[in-house]
Amino acid sequence: EEVFFRGYLQQQLGARFRSPLVWMGIPSVLFAIGHYQPAEAGENAVIIVVWAGLFGVLMADLTARAGSIGPALAVHFVNNVTALLITSLPDALGGLALWHTPFGMEDAEQLRAWLPVDFAMMIVSWLAARLALRR
């Protein structure tokens, strides 16, 4: 995902347009739309798209600041390892996880209670990567 959305699409749009709304926004919106799964997520599908859109904007920011997709790729890798191999939802992608949550993507009440923690971890990961880029 990072190679296409940040490594290719963001770079191509950045070479053609000056506005960050274009070269950060378009790849982030497309990234978010790619995470729309109403069959699996039910009424949570839209909030998951919002989560993915914010994640896309943060990764676009890292790519722009670093001048390479390396930091965004690293943060995305850590996010996916955590979500798929450490603690996962009990769905088709969670088969290798060490722990499963007691709720699935379609459980609106439980997932919405958990999402603020996930949003906070996303922001902390982004800030840590930005701090590392300063050094």
Indicate where each model-derived feature is located.
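Transmembrane helix-loop-helix hairpins at the membrane interface
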Residues: E1-R135
